Curated annotation (Swiss-Prot):
GO terms for cellular component: cytosolic large ribosomal subunit. CDD domains: Ribosomal_L22. Gene3D superfamilies: Ribosomal protein L22/L17. This is Large ribosomal subunit protein uL22. PROSITE patterns: RIBOSOMAL_L22. InterPro entries: Ribosomal_uL22, Ribosomal_uL22_bac/chlpt-type, Ribosomal_uL22_bac/org-type, Ribosomal_uL22_CS, Ribosomal_uL22_sf. The lineage of its organism: Bacteria, Bacillati, Bacillota, Bacillota incertae sedis, Caldicellulosiruptorales. The keyword rRNA-binding applies. One of its GO terms (biological process) is translation. Belongs to the universal ribosomal protein uL22 family. Part of the 50S ribosomal subunit. GO terms for molecular function: rRNA binding; structural constituent of ribosome. Pfam families: Ribosomal_L22.
Amino acid sequence: MEKAVNTNTEVKKATATLRYAMISPRKVRIVIDLIRNKPVQEALNILKFIPKRGARFVEKLLKSAIANAENNHNMNVDKLYIAEIYANGGPMLKRIRPRAQGRAFLIRKRTSHITVVLKERE
C-alpha cells in the first residue's frame, strides 16, 4: 500500500460579493466577460472606459475585493488577478403595467448577485 501524499498548498484568495444589485444579470455578464482572468489594474482601466451601467457596479465591487485582499489576507496588489467573476440572478420584483380593456402585463425588475474572487499569480 502506498501512502497518500499530502499536498496541502493552500492558495490565498480574496472575495467580494454584491447582492441585490438592481440590474439584470444578463446586462452585467456583458461587462464581466471582458475582465475575467485579467490583472486587477488592467481590469480597472477597462471598466473605467466602458459606457455601460453594469461597469460602475463591477468597478466598485472590484475595488472592494482589492481592499479585502490587501487588508484581510496580506496579498500583494501588483500580483492579483481576477480568478473568478460571475453574476447570478437574485429575486425578481414584480410590477404591474396596466393595459387596454382591463388587462395587466407583468413587469419583472431583475436583480443580480455579483461575486469576484481574486488570487495571486506565481
